[in-house]
Amino acid sequence: MGKPPAPIDMHPAPAEGAEADLSEQQGLVNDGVRKFAFPKEHPLRYALTNELHARPFEMLTPPVQTSMYATVLGEGAGSGVFDHLKALCERYGVNPPHRDMNHFSADFGPFRLRFERHTEFASYTVLRHGPFDVPFEKPASDFLPREWLESMPGEILLAIHVAILPVEGPDPDPQLLSDLFVPESLVNSILSGNSAQVWTDLRIHGDGHNRILLKPYDLPPAKAGRVVQRLLEIAAYRNFALLGLPAAREVGPELTRIDSGLAKLTAETASLVESGPEGNVAGQSNQTGATHRESELLIQLMQLSAEIERLNSRHSYRFSASRAYFALIRSRLTELREERVEGYQTIQEFLDRRLAPAMRTCESVEDRMASMSRRATRAANLLRTRVDFKLERQNQGLLSSMDRRAKMQLRLQQTVEGLSVAAITYYAVGLVGYAAKALSEFGLPVYP
C-alpha cells in the first residue's frame, strides 16, 4: 500500500502580502482595535452611547471639602457662561471646554472644578482634597478667585458647602453639631448600609450657604463621589422644584375669580339648554332677544377660555418642571438608602413633610387649570351646538319658505302663460277676420 495522503490544513497560512487583507477581513486593525464592516450607521449612535457616560462621578478620598453653586440662566446666557468659564481656565492654564459641552471637569491645582449645564441652570462644584481643622471654616470656594466668583452668570439659587470628615477620625460631637447647625432643624441619617452618616439642617447660614456634613465609614472614592453627587443634586433639585410654589400661590386667586365666572356662565348655559330650542332667558319674550343672549354667553365663555389658556401657557412649564424635579429627588433619596438615627428625621422624612405638600399644591393648581379649561370648552361647545341647531332650524324654515314662494311663482307663471296663449289666440283670430273681410271686398270668395 502507498503512503497515506498528507492531512489537509484546514487553516492554511495566508500568502505573503495577503496578511493585512486577511486581518482587515477579520476586523483587526493596528493597536488591537477591531474594525467591523457595518451597514450605514445612525448619525446619533456614538452620541447616544456617550451620553450615558457624559457626567461621571468624581473620585473623592476623604477628607474633602466641596462647594456647589447653581445659577438660574436666562435666555441667551450660553455664551456668557462659556466666556466666564474660559476666563478661569486661561487664568490657571487649563484647556477650556468646547462651547457646546454640557459637562466639564478639570484639575486647576489648588482645587478641582466640575461644571454642568442643565436645561435651565448651570452648576459649579469646587472640590479640594486635604485635611481641615473645622468644617466650613475655610471651604473649597475660598480657593476660587473672588472676582470670578462674584461675576458668575445668572442668579444664584443654591450655594452649599459639603465637608467630608476623615475616615479614621471620631464622629462629630454634639457641641460641634450645635455650632455648625440649627439644632431644631438638624437632620441625621445613616447612608448606604452604614457606609456613611450625614448631618444637615437645610438652612442658609450666615455665610449665605447651606451645609452638609458627611462622616464616612466605608466609602471608597467612587462611592464617596456618588453619595456626594446625590446629596448635592437633592439640594439643587429641591430649590428648583419649589420654584413652582410661588407661581401656584400667585395664580390661585385668579383661578378662583375665573372659576366663579365660569360657574355662573355654565349655569346660565344649562338653563338655556333645559328650556328647549326656542326657550328664552330671564323672561325674554322674543326669539331675537334669546339668540342675542346666547351670542353674548358664547363670547364670555370664549373670553374665560382665553384667560385660562393664558395662565396655563404662563405657568405650565414651571409646574411640569417642579413635577420632574420632585421625581428626581425621590429617585436620589431612594439611591441613598437612608436609615433612621434615633431622635432625628431622615432627609426623606423632612422633605416628605415640607416639600411634598408644596408639590401637591402645584399639582392641585395645575389640575385645576386643566379641569377649568375642559369645563369652559364643554360649556362653549354645548352653547355653540345650541346656536348651530337654532341656525339650522332657521335655515330649514327659510328653505321651506323659499320653496313655497317658488311653487307660487311657478303657478303664477303657468297662469300667466295660459292667459297669454288665450290673448294671443284671440288677437290672432281677430287679425284673420280682418284679413278675410278685406279679401272679400276684392271679390275673392272669402266669407268671414
Regions found by a protein language model. Give the residues of each.
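N-terminal pre-transmembrane cytosolic regions of membrane proteins
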Residues: M1-A163
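Conserved aromatic-histidine-acidic binding/catalytic patches
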Residues: F57, L243-P246, E250, R310, ...
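Structural beta-strand/beta-sheet cores of well-ordered domains, especially the beta-sheet scaffolds
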Residues: Q65-S67, E120-A122, N210, R360, ...
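Extended alpha-helical interaction modules
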Residues: E116, L127-Q300
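Conserved helix-loop functional segments at active or binding sites
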Residues: K264, E268-S271, L328-S331, E335, ...
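Membrane-associated alpha-helical segments
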Residues: E296-V429
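Juxtamembrane "helix exit" motif at the C-terminal ends of alpha-helical transmembrane segments
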Residues: T425-Y447
